[in-house]
Amino acid sequence: MSFDHQTIEKKWQDYWLKNKTFATREDKSKPKFYALDMFPYPSGAGLHVGHPEGYTATDILSRMKRMQGYNVLHPMGWDAFGLPAEQYALDTGNDPAVFTEQNIDNFRRQIRALGFSYDWDREVNTTDPDYYKWTQWIFLKLYEKGLAYVDEVPVNWCPALGTVLANEEVIDGKSERGGHPVERRPMKQWMLKITAYADRLLEDLEELDWPESIKEMQRNWIGRSEGAHVHFAVDGTNETFTVFTTRPDTLFGATYAVLAPEHDLVQKITTPEQKDAVNAYIEEVQSKSDLERTDLAKTKTGVFTGAYAVNPANGEKIPVWIADYVLATYGTGAVMAVPAHDERDHEFASAFGLPIKEVVKGGDVEKEAYTGDGEHIHSDFLNGLDKAAAIEKMIQWLEENGKGEKKVTYRLRDWLFSRQRYWGEPIPIIHWEDGTSTPVPEEELPLILPKTSEIKPSGTGESPLANIKEWVEVTDPETGKKGRRETNTMPQWAGSCWYFLRYIDPKNPNELASPEKLKEWLPVDMYIGGAEHAVLHLLYARFWHKFLYDIGVVPTKEPFKQLYNQGMILGENNEKMSKSKGNVVNPDEIVETHGADTLRLYEMFMGPLDASIAWSTTGLDGARRFLDRVWRLFIDDNGGLNEKIVEGAGETLERVYHETVMKVTDHFEGLRFNTGISQLMVFINEAYKADQLPKEYMEGFVKLLSPVAPHLAEELWNRLGHEETIAYEAWPVYDEAKLVDDEIEIVVQLNGKVKAKLNVPADADKEQLEELAKNNEKVKEQLEGKTIRKVIAVPGKLVNIVAN
């Protein structure tokens, strides 16, 4: 008989909701466990089967920890600002707030149908003014400390769309939507000085229990480089420029210099003969994104400015070029080129016939750059030195001669924080007619995003908010001075930088969260989400957290103690699920046909949590069959309790039960859910062979099953005679003594070849083993007509009989 999943699942979901079973209480007498999911963006498409994989993992941990006596915080919310809702509003004329609310209602319904043990009283929504009041408050604190500033930076401007596009929205110099030309244009933007935290973001990675691959990605993104600044004079002028190099030891081999096309000096130093070529090149570069420009595989392009710089080490004149692979926003916007010892410089020099001068022995530099260590040559006072010694000596020489200095740089850039969009948090700053800017007073927060019937690009590069005059234009009540509100909004990253803090105290109107509660719950014990957020979200969240630590808001330096990335669920054809491929599996359909418990069990049993695995309908059916077997073991065909279930413990199933408790507990703790579930299956197989089913073990099994299949477990627990929910029952513990085998298997060898296997008492000594081996029927047959010369018995392992 199969169980009716639809009735059972609805019954228990209603029970949990009505009784607030999973509401987190403040209880300092228990140890705490904070299990966090990366909250979803509530898209119009709804939940897909990839979402529940991570959510089920944190739910299993949360349910197990509650039963182990922990006070568990397990919340859910919505990362609801963002471009898709705005695009929908542009396309349909509908309000993104209404669209977003409908999507959230749908997501919430889908998530509840999967039986996750969230505390719904703590739900947050980044678009709720009571929430983004505090996002704005954090921005003002960053502004107060000089960490939020305005800078002019090149952006992707699309004249046809009248808006600025993010790098991801530009493909081959054209807008992703509509294929319109895109050009680079300098524009005033808000920046956050994440670079001020670069060293701490790097160093504190060492303390985190995170996958090494994620830590390495963050290290690379921060990209700390030690080297030197070297100052070059432009020949025949008073102009100079500075380059950063990690290899100052190769300065004698610098045969040309390259400036970014946007570098301030370009127009000043370009000779009249080269003006046309330089300007044409600059125009060509404007439509390229930074990613395209720095692509290592692309053909090198560039133009000579006509100017020469003076190599500070040897006084030689070297030509100054411009090339698109040098970015004005990275480093100093200028590089010294040493083609003999740098691959990119070698390619460029070969393409344009520039000199290649060897200064480190070790390769054939005419053929390719030699980037290894070696003895320095053609380098005056560095000759004979290796790389490390030469770098140190050159930096000393540069500093003594005023030609440069030691320098640490980072690949990490300050965070471009403004978006020319409507659907985001308004930035609480007012720009006055006298050129000054002031923050909106704290007591006036939240600065609410105004409702508007028409969201369309301003056409000026400003956000659509610029069109709403009555909101934008303000007057200072004290001085009568006129001003304009900042019309840029914050990026979607802003709300997700700190949401885990608001869950701790979600209804607090007076502060981001109470210091006492933050102290109680931080750091997050387990954070599970997709690896696509490995760098940006996690880096930004760590940056804000460290800043909040510095100003005394949070008590910990790091937000997330342990991080785990679940793998991706692929379509049955092993391709990524996508609407265009038509291979998306909707969880609603699975819940309808197989049940939420089956979906949860299947996704955890597919394979290791961090692996990417193809969806399989056969596997899903198998998961359902297992749950049906569990049901039939407990419930007979008439709907009553199986009469084999008897009071007490008893010896039947004793060993496999204790082994199951040990393995399931250990494997669930280690996020090895697939192997934990395998052991639950082992127990059920053994139970089907037993004549009696001791109630203590059967109840223990239901507890072990409950984090994975909570609806079925609640129903069985109820049928076993319990009135209360299983959610806070004590997690089973195993007895080490019951895991020891009374009997073990040994092999019997005849002249070194295995002839039989015997089950013998675990404590059998040599004499007993010899006796048991000789009396074994199989062994007797083999010994017929032979004389035993010697018997070697090794307790716990083998008996070897030598006979001829």
Curated annotation (Swiss-Prot):
GO annotation, cellular component aspect: cytosol
EC identifiers of the protein: 6.1.1.4
Catalytic activity: tRNA(Leu) + L-leucine + ATP = L-leucyl-tRNA(Leu) + AMP + diphosphate
Pfam families (alphabetical): Anticodon_1, tRNA-synt_1_2, tRNA-synt_1g
Chief location: cytoplasm
GO terms, molecular function: aminoacyl-tRNA deacylase activity; ATP binding; leucine-tRNA ligase activity
Motif ('KMSKS' region): 576-580
Segments carrying motif 'HIGH' region: 40-51
Positions that bind ATP: K579
InterPro entries attached to this UniProt entry: aa-tRNA-synth_I_CS, Leu-tRNA-ligase, Leu_tRNA-synth_edit, M/V/L/I-tRNA-synth_anticd-bd, Methionyl/Leucyl_tRNA_Synth, Rossmann-like_a/b/a_fold, tRNAsynth_Ia_anticodon-bd, Val/Leu/Ile-tRNA-synth_edit
Annotated GO biological process: leucyl-tRNA aminoacylation
UniProtKB keywords: Aminoacyl-tRNA synthetase, ATP-binding, Cytoplasm, Ligase, Nucleotide-binding, Protein biosynthesis
HAMAP family on file: Leu_tRNA_synth_B
Record family assignment: Belongs to the class-I aminoacyl-tRNA synthetase family.
Name of the protein this chain belongs to: Leucine--tRNA ligase
Source taxonomy: Bacteria, Bacillati, Bacillota, Bacilli, Bacillales
